[in-house]
């Protein structure tokens, strides 16, 4: 399952002005150094403004809220001891050690 204590790690909050184009940027996920997922933000079915517009019809969104969306193809299981590194060009990387 995806929903358990400390199961949604995220990196530092950055001002939008420091990120460049929010609709363009390569992203990748490696597991133990092996590339598992690659994609680009321009491949998202729903763009960020569309997601915000839709969700705000049902939920009150506030500064600091996080909206999680889908992921590129290549989803697979991970195991205890695996090291996952997610990178988004122009934003940075986040490393997660599976425990």
List each model region and its residues.
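Catalytic-pocket segment enriched in acidic/His residues
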Residues: 1-99
């Amino acid at each position: 399952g995806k929903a358990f204590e400390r199961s949604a790690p995220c990196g530092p909050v950055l001002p939008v002005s420091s990120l460049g184009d929010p609709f363009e940027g390569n992203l990748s996920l490696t597991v133990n150094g092996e590339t598992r997922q690659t994609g680009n933000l321009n491949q998202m079915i729903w763009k960020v403004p569309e997601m915000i517009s839709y969700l705000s019809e049902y939920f009150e969104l506030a500064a600091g809220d996080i909206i999680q969306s889908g992921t590129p193809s290549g989803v697979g299981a991970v195991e205890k001891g695996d090291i996952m590194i997610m990178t988004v060009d122009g934003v940075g990387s986040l490393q997660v050690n599976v425990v």
